From Swiss-Prot:
UniProt xrefs under InterPro entries: Ribosomal_bL20 (IPR005813), RIBOSOMAL_L20_CS (IPR049946), Ribosomal_protein_bL20_C (IPR035566)
Gene of this entry: rplT
GO cellular component terms attached to this protein's record: cytosolic large ribosomal subunit
GO terms assigned for molecular function: rRNA binding; structural constituent of ribosome
Protein name per UniProt: Large ribosomal subunit protein bL20
Pfam families: Ribosomal_L20
Stated role: Binds directly to 23S ribosomal RNA and is necessary for the in vitro assembly process of the 50S ribosomal subunit. It is not involved in the protein synthesizing functions of that subunit.
């Protein structure tokens, strides 16, 4: 089997890692071994936190909807149940935005949910 010297490929692989590590502090952006560990960890955190972000935003929306629905005399669960009974298909993101930006509109939606009880 012929010998493979890998000069170009090895340099390209190292440069790819060091490019991803750009902006890291100290040796983590300069030395290949440190940069590899830092980049691996950063990519793992990024992957994990893309999932966590969805959970966090849903929790924030639910908190905002709950606060606004309690101002209208309903709990969050009763509001959601009433909206499902009334066949109002507004998702939590839009409901939370309404609760913050348009309280009157939200209270009209809450009255729709109240009418189901």
């Amino acid at each position: 089997m012929p010998r493979v010297k890998r000069g170009f490929k090895a340099r390209r692989r190292r440069n790819k890692v060091l490019k991803l590590a750009k902006g890291f502090r100290g040796a983590r952006s300069k030395l290949f071994r440190s940069a590899t560990e830092a980049v691996d960890r950063a990519l793992n955190y990024a992957f994990r936190d893309r999932k966590v972000k969805k959970r966090d935003f849903r929790a924030l929306w639910i908190t905002r909807i709950n606060a606004a629905s309690r101002l209208n005399g309903l709990s969050y669960s009763k509001l959601i149940h009433g909206l499902k009974q009334a066949q109002v298909e507004i998702d939590r993101k839009v409901l939370a935005d309404l609760a913050v930006s348009d309280p009157k509109g939200f209270s009209e939606i809450a009255t729709l949910a109240k009418a189901q009880f």
